[in-house]
Every structure is written in structure tokens, then in C-alpha cells.
């Protein structure tokens, strides 16, 4: 990935994403960056490295001593979205059928959730479910379901970072 000066688009720092995959520990020479989002908690980018399954927390406060924290998630990371508090970043590992959850305040993974076939790599949607409280929902490419994941570890700890419902044809 490249960190650039915003107004001029001048490259300031180029960082390789080459590395080992999280599951088989095979070397991948050209993994792609699938998403880059800005943290609401720290001067930090959250970078999804697709083929390796690693999420990089890139502290850009000192480019001369760049600090990168590596979190192991699941291969085939794609895009994702924030919970309603903008603390937790939920991101799809679409061909691994998982959703990874990053706590951007504490800078760690808090969940790697098994979901139904091919979660859609999108931003998702946040709303308050009448039974499960705050949830984040995402569709799928491999089926017609919308998966709901509980996102309130303080108020609804028993549902946090779990699939609480799947909405599909049976609910229509």
C-alpha cells in the first residue's frame, strides 16, 4: 500500500504486503489490498490484505518509524463496515465464509464469525433489532440471506459477535 500526501497525491511511504497466508503459511508474493479505512479511534488505517488474510493496523503518526500491527483473520478478506459506534470494524472474508471483527480502540481482533456461504463484501447496515439489540447486517453472494450479527458487547454480551439471525425466504 502507499501512504500519500492528500493535497498533492505525492507518495510518502510505500509498504509491501507480501507475506505468509494465515492458514497454510504459504508465501504469497503479490497479495492485494482489498480495503483501507480510517480509524475513528487512533491516527491509523485499517488495511485488509486479501490473499494472506491479514488485517494491518497502520499507525501513520510517524512515517519515519511506521508502526504496523498485524492481526490474523481469514483469507480472502474484502470490504467491510463499521458498527454504529464506529469502534468496531466488521469485514468479510468472502471465500472463507467468515466475518472478522476488529476493535479499533483496543487494536485487536474480537471475533472471527462463521457465516453462511460467501458474505457480501459491502459496508453492511446497522439497526436495533427488537430482540437482539444493536446488530450489523450483511447480504451474501452465495445465497439470498441477510446475516445479522450482534454488535453490543456492553448491553447485549450474550449476542455480541455472534450470528443472531439470518433473514431469507423463510421470513417473507
How would you name each of these model-derived features?
Residues 1-171:
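Predominantly soluble domains enriched in secretory-pathway, periplasmic, or organellar proteins
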Amino acid at each position: 500500500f502507499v501512504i500519500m500526501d492528500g493535497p498533492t497525491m505525492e507518495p510518502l511511504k510505500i509498504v509491501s504486503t507480501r507475506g505468509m497466508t494465515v492458514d497454510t503459511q504459504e508465501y504469497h508474493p503479490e497479495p492485494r489490498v482489498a480495503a483501507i479505512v480510517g480509524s475513528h479511534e487512533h491516527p491509523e488505517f485499517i488495511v485488509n490484505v486479501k490473499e494472506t488474510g491479514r488485517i494491518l493496523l497502520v499507525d501513520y503518526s510517524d512515517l519515519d518509524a511506521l508502526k504496523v500491527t498485524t492481526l490474523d483473520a481469514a483469507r480472502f478478506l474484502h470490504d467491510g463496515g463499521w458498527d454504529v459506534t464506529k469502534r468496531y470494524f466488521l469485514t468479510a472474508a468472502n471465500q472463507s465464509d467468515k466475518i472478522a471483527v476488529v476493535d479499533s480502540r483496543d487494536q485487536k481482533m474480537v471475533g472471527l464469525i462463521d457465516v453462511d456461504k460467501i458474505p457480501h463484501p459491502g459496508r453492511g447496515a446497522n439497526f436495533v433489532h427488537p430482540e437482539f439489540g444493536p446488530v450489523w447486517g450483511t447480504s451474501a453472494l452465495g445465497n439470498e440471506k441477510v446475516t445479522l450479527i450482534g454488535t453490543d458487547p456492553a448491553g447485549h454480551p450474550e449476542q455480541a459477535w455472534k450470528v443472531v439471525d439470518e433473514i431469507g425466504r423463510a421470513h417473507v
